[in-house]
Amino acid sequence: MLRPILASFLLALPLVAQAGDLVLNDIKAQNGVQLSVDELKQLMPNAKVVSYSEGGSSRHWKNEPDGKFVASSDVRRDPNRPGKVANAQGTWRVGDNGTYCVTLEWPKRSESWCRYIFKVGEKYYGVKSITDGTATAQEFEFSK
């Protein structure tokens, strides 16, 4: 009797692991609303931003009105350096196509991306594409 229960549990594990990864189709299914260019231009200047990387790191910065910021990260992607913090110079802008675009110059690498921003309830998510329903949704926090 225990063996069938254990087998069912083990088969379900991959589904549970994937459940935390939201994609654009999930955002749309939850009635997520894409922010317009005008809404982004209202929200982004002076916004305090928290961005969560795919590796689990959280990065913090404040969008200065001049399009610049200094970011810090808790560098969770490197298990050999617990407690390590990295800083980066960055720039931000709102694209004409309705994307929030960021460039970061970390000590060992550069990062540049644009995301379409959706709001679901009180949470924000960014996606690379608004046509690919399987595009991974990255969580953001924006506050003033």
Label the model's feature ranges.
Residues A7-P14:
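Bacterial N-terminal signal peptides
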Residues M1-P4:
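Positively charged n-region of N-terminal signal peptides that target proteins for export
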